[in-house]
Design a protein with these regions (language model features):
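Conserved alpha/beta-domain cores
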Residues: 1-130
């Protein structure tokens, strides 16, 4: 991993945090109440972990295959990883143990499959419905 890439992650996070803080101040909101989610779309696990090392505590993955490929490399537990993209019903059982929330439930059929797979593992899955 190039040092320039890691430095760019640091600089980007610094800028994003500054912008979030500015926006919060403008609307009278406490910046500590805002959670930054780093979306990992096509970003190598090494750079994602550089963001985690800089204090990012929540990841968003939008592709099941990428999540499966990178999951074991992440420095965060499943509870701090959200699935944010369209999830195909046939991929639910592959990602159910790797995320703490599925933010993209767009059908009753998908919700039922999530419930079935989660129950089979003795857990519940938090979801957001589109």
């Amino acid at each position: 991993m190039e040092n320039r890439s890691v430095e760019r992650v640091r600089e980007n996070l610094k800028e994003i945090r500054f912008r979030v803080e500015e926006a919060c101040v403008k609307c009278g909101r406490d910046p500590s109440q805002v959670t930054l989610m780093a979306v990992t779309k096509t970003v190598p696990a090494e750079l994602v972990n550089a963001a985690v090392a800089e204090g990012v505590t929540l990841l968003g993955e939008n592709r099941a295959q990428e999540l499966l490929e990178k999951f074991d490399s992440y420095f965060l537990p499943p509870e701090q990883i959200h699935f944010i993209g369209h999830l195909q019903t046939n991929k639910v059982r592959q990602v159910i143990d790797k995320v703490g929330m599925i933010e993209s439930v767009d059908s009753v059929r998908l919700a039922a499959e999530i419930e079935r797979c989660a129950a089979a593992r003795g857990r519940t899955m938090e979801v957001l419905v589109e």
